[in-house]
Amino acid sequence: MSCTRMIHVLDPRPLTSSVMPVDMAMRICLAHSPPLKSFLGPYNGFQRRNFVNKLKPLKPCLSVKQEAKSQSEWKSPHNQAKKRVVFADSKGLSLTAIHVFSDLPEEPAWDLQFDLLDLNDISSSLKLHEEKNLVFDFPQPSTDYLSFRDRFQKNFVCLENCSLQDRTVTGTVKVKNVSFEKKVQVRITFDTWKTYTDVDCVYMKNVYSSSDSDTFSFAIDLPRVIPTEEKIEFCISYHANGRIFWDNNEGQNYRIVHVQWKPDGVQTQVAPKDCAFQQGPPKTEIEPTVFGSPRLASGLFPEWQSWGRVENLTSYR
């Protein structure tokens, strides 16, 4: 096909005799022939679709979970500081004062002090155990010094002091210094002299030196179980110069008896089961007075001499 025929197809209008290339290009651009529009139609639709797609917003490549946002919103109220209102006085101190009140009234300090008489009753009621129901049935020999001195001069041996504590009998014995070699023993029985035991005494150095007397000590453990019908008695023997001197408490022996404690604190001797208790003549007992006195001190602590016995305070001679 020649160029002239092509131009007639695009534009049927008449052409000049001379056709320039510019004229042909202008006709092609300005021509509205149906074949060209139909040819360019699909391309225009593709451009419009591309333009619409370019206007759409792009999706982000990172996705944020909604849970993190909800948790942050849930925690945010706690992070906020709570508002507080504090009232103060003129000096800036708090107006709040706390006072604690007790339903029970406080007792004065003087009510906490023990009454000596009540304390004595309590201690007496506690002595109901078997280990505490043994006592001496004789006064301390050194309490009456005049009698002790006479017996010492006559028998050459005499029990000086004796104590019973934790089922152990301890004491001291005074002997006359008749020879250098001496032997002092305590003969004791726990079954009314069916059997007996001789316990050696130990020499003690005299605190107050005396050339005519010596002091010995002893300690005897009592059996754990002693029948109440059996008698517990002991005496002192002194061996010197081939002779034996005895101190048997003027023939009565030194006895340890079972006693029964009563709620009022009074001690009564337990009678044997096989025979009635023979009560002897009443003995002179020391009655304790309130808050202590010379009489009470001499009864509880015989080694403490009082002004009432100042006439008896002489040496062991």
Curated annotation (Swiss-Prot):
GO cellular component: cytosol
Record PTM: Ubiquitinated by NHLRC1/malin in a EPM2A/laforin-dependent manner.
GO molecular function per UniProt: glycogen binding; molecular adaptor activity; protein phosphatase binding
Gene3D superfamilies: Carbohydrate binding type-21 domain (2.60.40.2440)
Source superkingdom: Eukaryota
Short motif PP1-binding motif, span: 84-87
Alphabetical GO biological process terms: glycogen biosynthetic process; glycogen metabolic process; protein targeting
Every CBM21 domain range: 149-257
InterPro entries attached to this UniProt entry: CBM21_dom (IPR005036), CBM21_dom_sf (IPR038175), Pase-1_reg-su_3B/C/D_met (IPR017434), PP1_3C (IPR030683), PP1_regulatory_subunit_3 (IPR050782)
CDD domains xref list: PBD_PPP1R3C (cd22815)
Result of knocking out the encoding gene: Mice display embryonic lethality when homozygous. Heterozygotes display decreased protein levels, decreased glycogen accumulation and glycogen synthase activity, reduced insulin-stimulated glycogen synthesis and progressive age-dependent glucose intolerance. When Ppp1r3c is silenced in adults, they display decreased PP1 activity and glycogen accumulation, increased phosphorylation of glycogen phosphorylase, increased GLUT1 levels, increased glucose uptake and increased glycogen degradation.
Pfam families for this protein: CBM_21 (PF03370)
UniProt keywords, alphabetically: Carbohydrate metabolism, Glycogen metabolism, Ubl conjugation
Annotated consequence of substituting residue 87 to A: Abolishes binding to PP1 but has no effect on binding to glycogen synthase, glycogen phosphorylase or glycogen
Renumbered residue ranges of the record's region Interaction with EPM2A: 141-263
UniProt free text on domains: The N-terminal region is required for binding to PP1, the central region is required for binding to glycogen and the C-terminal region is required for binding to glycogen phosphorylase, glycogen synthase and phosphorylase kinase.
Subunit text: Interacts with PPP1CC catalytic subunit of PP1 and associates with glycogen. Forms complexes with glycogen phosphorylase, glycogen synthase and phosphorylase kinase which is necessary for its regulation of PP1 activity. Also interacts with EPM2A/laforin.
Function: Acts as a glycogen-targeting subunit for PP1 and regulates its activity. Activates glycogen synthase, reduces glycogen phosphorylase activity and limits glycogen breakdown. Dramatically increases basal and insulin-stimulated glycogen synthesis upon overexpression in a variety of cell types.
PANTHER family (UniProt xref): PROTEIN PHOSPHATASE 1 REGULATORY SUBUNIT, PROTEIN PHOSPHATASE 1 REGULATORY SUBUNIT 3C
Name the UniProt record assigns to this protein: Protein phosphatase 1 regulatory subunit 3C
Organism: Mus musculus
Lineage: Eukaryota, Metazoa, Chordata, Craniata, Vertebrata
